Amino acid sequence: MAIVEVVKYDGNPDVLVWKYPSQELGTWTQLIVNESQEAVLYKGGKIFDVFQSGRHTLETANIPLLNKVINLPFGGRSPFTAEVWFVNKLYSLDVKWGTPTPIQIQDPKYGVFVPVRANGRFGIQIEDSEKFLIKLVGSVSVFDRQSLVKHFRGLYITKAKDTISSYVVHKQVSPLEINAYLDEMSIFLKEKMEPVM
């Protein structure tokens, strides 16, 4: 298999994490990390280094831990295997969510049950690439916004249903008048959801 000369990712901005397909690298391989990205180098199942934006040569002087695991028989130029993961650090504001089925809420004024749906959008930004890879992505080679929404769907739907029902009951808001309270309700929902997300 050929040794990769340049490693970079210029793909879809909806992709949060992307694993470079080849693991055949060399101490002369150029790693190009765009402004809104970080690149994480894995060797032997462990994180070796995290690279910020810029052009990096994967040489042992730049990555001291490589000295311990690769043999340098060719005058400091040696092939080695490692994984490179690109993490999108861009702030994404357009992640949509919604309840797949209506929430049955009892109207406090009339005593009847009214079906209510909730939907909206939220923003995400990966703050800690290492933690995100280890705790959420695992070994999935592509993790996009849709994967994130699927991962948290059960959690945020349950919390949203709970919070909306609680708001309506405690504030004695009729579901028929709910549109007049959307701003206040959105703030209440955001406060309850932030610790979970």
What is the role of each PLM region?
Residues M1-M197:
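N-terminal hydrophobic membrane-entry segments
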